[in-house]
């Protein structure tokens, strides 16, 4: 039985995505699903080679064939997932292997629909999520989500950015039970080039671009 599906959408990250895969603990109750979104570098070839060289990792590699965008790629990843929980490991991030492994061990001890973890960011600071402020919204990277809870929810494929925000909004309307683990398990590449916050700060994304 698959406890956790680790989902990675990737586009032109031929080196960083391998670092993320290297950080994943090797265990029999997880699966890793990577979907390439029409990369023009060696990303897809590197992923296929990695899969061949690491049979200890239960891994599937898919290709969109052309660039479909983050939302469409995320929807395809979710459709392929088999785990009771899923987690998005972004292609330029890594997990803190031992802590992440511990958190997977503890997943069944949580009764929540969402299990949140704390994040380590680029400057060495730790984002300790504050339960009193409902901070599990902060990034999709900080959450293990029970797959059955979000059945029927999809990422909107017609927005230019912020697709994870719309997914989160619809998910929260279902009033999930959120549990905060307090475990620092994810190394978040923040601020990341191309993030919603980064694009808005540089004037490359306007509020009207965030309309579904």
Give the positions of each predicted feature.
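Conserved donor NDP-sugar-binding/catalytic core segment of glycosyltransferases
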Residues: 94, 98-128
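Short, well-formed alpha-helical segments that are part of the catalytic scaffolds
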Residues: 13-26
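A conserved acidic beta->alpha catalytic loop
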Residues: 36-45, 66, 90
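Acidic helix N-cap motif at the loop->helix transition within catalytic regions
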Residues: 16-18, 41-50
């Amino acid at each position: 039985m698959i406890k956790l599906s680790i989902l990675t959408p990737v586009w032109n990250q031929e080196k960083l995505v391998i670092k993320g895969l290297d950080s994943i603990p090797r265990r029999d109750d997880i699966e890793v699903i990577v979907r390439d979104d029409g990369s023009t570098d060696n990303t897809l070839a590197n992923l296929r080679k990695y899969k061949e060289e690491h049979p200890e990792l239960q891994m599937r590699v898919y290709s969109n064939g052309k660039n479909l965008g983050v939302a469409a790629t995320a929807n395809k990843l979710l459709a392929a997932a088999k785990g009771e929980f899923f987690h998005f490991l972004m292609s330029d991030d890594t997990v803190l292997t031992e802590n992440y492994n511990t958190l997977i061990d503890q997943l069944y001890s949580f009764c929540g629909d969402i299990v949140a973890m704390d994040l380590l960011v680029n400057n060495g600071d730790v984002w300790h999520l504050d339960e009193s402020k409902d901070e599990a919204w902060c990034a999709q990277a900080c959450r293990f989500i029970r797959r059955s809870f979000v059945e029927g929810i999809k990422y909107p494929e017609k927005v230019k950015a912020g697709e994870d925000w719309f997914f989160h909004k619809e998910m929260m309307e279902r009033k999930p039970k959120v549990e905060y683990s307090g475990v620092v398990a994810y190394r978040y590449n923040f601020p990341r080039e191309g993030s919603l916050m980064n694009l808005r700060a540089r004037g490359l994304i306007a509020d009207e671009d965030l309309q579904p």
